[in-house]
Structure formats: structure tokens, C-alpha cells
Design a protein with these regions (language model features):
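"…together with the soluble PPM/PP2C metallo-phosphatase catalytic core" -> "…together
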Residues: 2-284
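Short flexible/disordered coil segments
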Residues: 115-119, 294, 346-347
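Hydrophobic transmembrane alpha-helices of multi-pass small-molecule transporters
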Residues: 193-197, 289, 338
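A short, structure-level motif marking secondary-structure boundaries and short turns
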Residues: 28-30, 156-157, 296-298, 340-342, ...
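Membrane-proximal soluble regions of multi-pass membrane proteins
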Residues: 50-53, 71, 280-329
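Final/C-terminal transmembrane alpha-helix of multipass membrane proteins
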Residues: 324-345
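Short beta-alpha connecting loops at secondary-structure transitions
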Residues: 220-221, 275, 296-300, 349
Length: 349
């Protein structure tokens, strides 16, 4: 909205041209989202349900009694700030609407004693992921660019929708599984969104740089980058209160929308393999456990039998890592690995 307003007010007062700058709006949106989340969380978390702990989770008793479901506070902040700083585009409005639905699903799980069943959550996640995939492609073929090879691939609708649905479902649940240590899911996600935002804004949203690196240029890349940085701001405000020892937990109302948005942004980049680059630690920590359960439950195939998942539970119980050690080491791994993998992704083609 501010972007449109900048054009209307430019003739009245010259400095209003700042509202036409995507970089200014990204910075303003990030700071505003962080400030509003930081301010509103402690004023509303007394109304949130209390955490009841998780069966078999390491250190679950440390979280019991704390307010859970903070996503129901910071996700609306994300939506409102995004509406303020995004260019007017129907597809972005559709994305924000579905993210609110994902938040509501998570909040229902947070509020219900014992939560929703795994199958209920899985089916709802699948339906919402399908909706996200349809929003991305608009029932049109989608151009995909890949690592190593320079040629682009045009995916037909019948191929893109199931593949995109699977990726969004995976990121939604992997991020949810990572939410088990104070600050971990929020910090890893914030790092991922910062890298994603940088790629979407500075490379894929820039005609000169994208041409130099032989990757597609997306005119709406700056809009997707804005979503990424605004969510980063919300996570910064949340992490202020979630730093160990935490005062509030994001719950499914936060982790599921975060994972959903992450999958959407990766697909908006045109390269689904980017998920391994910006969210590798989240996938290893959470998604490998999902794979282990899936193979064992449906095919009676046991893998990683000596490894406890999510991986953060394994290193705490088997390696004796403290919660701060898990947080710092996992985040450092993501910070160091992502630039190296980005270099490979964009230069080895």
C-alpha cells in the first residue's frame, strides 16, 4: 500500500519518493514487524494456552506451563505489515490469506488438550500445501532453473502442483519438528529467511545480476523478498522473548506458518533445490525424522535406528549438549554452510 501511496504523494512532497523504494520498504517493514511483535507479545501471551509438554521429548518438563501459540500474535503482525509495505498484487493477498489459515490450524492444535492427531494435521497440511501450490502456478506451466545445468525446465501444471505440494508440506512439518529447544526454530528460520530474502531481492529480483549469473529474472522477486524480510522481523521480535530461558513458545501456530512460507518462497525462487541451501539444518533436524517414521509405519523399513529424532533431542540425550549449545551450534552450521552452498548453486552452472 505504501508503494502505491508513494506515487500519489510524490508531487506533493519530494521525499515521499522513498515510498517507491523497495529497499526502504523492506527495511521499514522489517523494523516495524520486529517492534510490533516485541511490544505486543508480552501484552497478550497471558491469553494463550499453556504448554502441556510432549511425550518422550527431552527436557519437555522445562516448557510446561509456559504460554504457547505465540504465532497467533506475530503471524497477524506479519500479515498486516506485509499489506502495508507490499506492492498491490492479488497473488500476495492469496498467500497471506492461506498463511492465516495455516496459523489457525496450528492454534487449534495448540489449544486442544493432546493436540490434533498426526493424521488430522497431515491431511490439513496437505490441503493447505495444495492450495499454496495452486496459488504459485495459477494453473499455468512454471519455469524451473536447476543447479549445474544452464537450461531451464518448463514444468507442466500436472507435474508442478504435486511436487510443490510435497515441498510445502515437508517444510511445514520439518520446521514444526525443529521447534523443541528455546530459540532454535525461530533462529534457524530467521537465518533462512534472511538468506532467502537476499537471493530473491539482490539476485533473482535484479535484472543485471540475474543475467550475469544466468538465472531467470523475476519482476515480483522484490515482493517475495519483502515477505521474507518482514517475517524475519517478526521472528526477531519473538526471539527477544524466546531466548533461553524462554518466556513464551511459538507453538504450531507459529512454526507451521513459518515452514509454509519458507516452502512458498523457495518455490517462488524457481529452484526447489534452494531449500537444501537455506534450510539444510532444519531439514536434517526435522525432515529426516519424518522420513524415518514414514518408512517404518507404512513400509516396516527401519533406518537410522540408533539416532533419535528430531536430531536436537539426540544430541541433548546422547551427546550431552545443553540447550544453548544446541542453539548456537545448529545456527552456526546454517550460517556457515549456506554461503558455500549458494556459491555452488549460482556459480557451478
Amino acid at each position: 500500500m505504501l508503494h502505491w501511496l508513494g506515487y500519489q504523494l510524490l508531487e506533493i512532497y519530494g521525499p515521499f519518493r522513498l515510498l517507491k523504494s523497495h529497499l526502504f520498504l523492506i527495511g521499514f517493514g522489517t523494523a516495524l514487524a520486529a517492534s510490533l511483535t516485541w511490544y505486543w507479545l508480552p501484552r497478550f501471551w497471558k491469553r494463550l494456552p499453556s504448554d502441556l509438554g510432549r511425550l518422550y521429548a527431552v527436557g519437555a518438563n522445562q516448557s510446561m506451563g509456559k504460554p504457547v501459540g505465540a504465532g497467533v500474535i506475530f503471524v497477524p503482525v506479519f500479515v498486516l505489515v506485509s499489506l502495508l509495505v507490499l506492492p498491490i498484487d492479488l497473488r500476495f493477498l492469496e498467500v497471506l490469506a492461506v498463511i492465516l489459515l495455516v496459523m489457525l490450524e496450528g492454534y487449534l492444535d495448540d489449544r486442544k488438550p493432546g493436540g490434533l492427531s498426526e493424521y488430522q494435521l497431515g491431511i490439513i497440511d496437505l490441503g493447505l500445501a495444495l492450495l499454496g501450490a495452486i496459488i504459485l502456478c495459477q494453473f499455468q506451466p512454471v519455469q524451473i532453473w536447476l543447479p549445474i545445468i544452464k537450461a531451464d525446465v518448463l514444468l507442466p501444471v500436472w507435474a508442478f502442483i504435486p511436487l510443490a505440494t510435497a515441498l510445502i508440506w515437508l517444510t511445514t512439518n520439518a520446521t514444526n519438528c525443529t521447534d523443541g529447544v528455546d530459540g532454535l526454530s525461530g533462529s534457524l528460520s530467521a537465518v533462512s529467511f534472511m538468506y532467502l530474502g537476499g537471493v530473491l531481492y539482490a539476485i533473482l529480483g535484479h535484472p543485471g545480476i540475474s543475467e550475469y549469473l544466468l538465472v531467470p529474472y523475476y519482476e515480483d522477486g522484490t515482493g517475495w523478498a519483502t515477505l521474507s524480510f518482514v517475517m524475519t522481523g517478526c521472528l526477531i521480535g519473538y526471539l527477544w522473548h524466546n531466548a533461553p530461558p524462554s518466556l513464551v513458545l511459538m507453538g504450531d501456530a507459529g512454526s507451521r506458518p513459518i515452514g509454509f512460507l519458507m516452502g512458498m518462497l523457495v518455490l517462488a525462487s524457481g529452484n526447489p533445490f534452494l531449500i537444501f541451501v537455506v534450510s539444510g539444518v532444519i531439514l536434517v533436524n526435522g525432515a529426516t525424522g519424518l522420513l524415518k517414521v514414514f518408512l517404518l509405519r507404512f513400509f516396516k523399513i527401519g533406518i537410522f535406528k540408533k539416532v533419535r529424532y528430531p536430531l536436537h533431542d539426540h544430541v541433548r540425550r546422547e551427546k550431552g549438549w545443553s540447550n544453548p549449545q544446541v542453539l548456537v551450534r545448529f545456527v552456526l552450521l546454517q550460517i556457515v554452510l549456506t554461503p558455500l552452498l549458494l556459491l555452488f548453486l549460482f556459480k557451478v552452472r
